[in-house]
């Protein structure tokens, strides 16, 4: 009876874990709901591993990292290039995450960003972050709870990074105001039908960049009265796609520009 009780207990734990992982895989929020309007560029990949892995073999990367000011990153790059890491099944699964990263600039050309990572079924772990991270007591990370909003802040050399899990997603930003807008989780409602079609469009290349043409042009011509006249060519809501893949043998580029 004792052994049978242990067996039932273990089966119960396995069942609870299975249900929790299934729930985490099904209870989803789309990344675009966390991306505020008016970005300069939005970088998307369906798999971080598939996007980054080919870049590790580029000969150009060796030349770039051979410079003295990149010496701090050379060791990290060599370790990442190691087959033991790249072919590790657990690492592959962990890095096969959808990533969206949106870049913004204000009127003073200060840059900010929102990064949204879709952990899928692995969000069974990230959903517990508010309980796990305080226990780990990681240096520089503090949990904030104010006005009903709880999130984490990572302080590094005077810079603050804000992050929080939302269902299957983890949101990261260096700008608190943008971070709060992202956490409303309804930003997808602010895009029109044409924009959503562009944002959700699949590409054959591993990396897709969605550009707000007017926002980018404005950042370059805002002080030039003559060039600013060309700004009217671009619709306020028009988005364009640049997707690409890079190997030593070839660079693949695709453009999708509305006219």
Question: Where are the language model's segments positioned?
Answer:
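Generic beta-strand structural signal
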Residues: 105, 143-146, 163-166, 173, ...
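Structural boundary/hinge residues at secondary-structure and domain interfaces
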Residues: 4-8, 13-140, 144-151, 197-233, ...
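Extended, charge-rich low-complexity interaction segments
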Residues: 174-184, 227-247
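A conserved glycine-rich beta-strand in the N-terminal activation segment of trypsin-fold
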Residues: 152-224
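Short solvent-exposed loop/turn micro-motifs enriched in small/polar/acidic residues
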Residues: 145, 153-157, 237
């Amino acid at each position: 009876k004792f052994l049978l009780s242990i067996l039932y207990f273990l089966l119960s734990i396995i069942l609870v874990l299975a249900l929790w992982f299934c729930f985490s895989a099904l209870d989803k929020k789309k990344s675009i709901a966390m991306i505020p309007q008016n970005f300069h560029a939005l970088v998307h990949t369906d798999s971080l591993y598939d996007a980054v892995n080919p870049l590790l073999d580029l000969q150009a990367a060796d030349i770039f990292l051979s410079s003295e000011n990149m010496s701090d990153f050379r060791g990290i790059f060599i370790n990442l290039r190691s087959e033991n890491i790249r072919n590790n099944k657990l690492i592959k699964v962990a890095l096969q995450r959808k990533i969206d990263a949106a870049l913004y600039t204000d009127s003073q050309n200060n840059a900010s960003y929102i990064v949204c990572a879709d952990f899928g079924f692995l969000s069974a772990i990230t959903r517990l972050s508010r309980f796990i991270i305080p226990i780990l007591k990681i240096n520089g990370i503090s949990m904030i709870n104010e006005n009903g909003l709880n999130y984490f802040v990572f302080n590094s050399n005077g810079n603050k990074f804000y992050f929080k899990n939302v269902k299957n997603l983890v949101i990261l930003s260096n700008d608190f105001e943008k971070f709060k807008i992202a956490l409303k989780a309804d930003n997808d409602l602010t895009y029109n039908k044409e924009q959503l079609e562009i944002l959700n469009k699949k590409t054959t290349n591993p990396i897709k960049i969605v550009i707000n043409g007017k926002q980018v042009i404005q950042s370059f011509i805002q002080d030039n009265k003559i060039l600013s006249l060309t700004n009217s060519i671009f619709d306020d809501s028009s988005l364009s796609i640049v997707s690409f893949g890079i190997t030593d043998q070839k660079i693949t580029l695709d453009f999708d520009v509305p006219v």
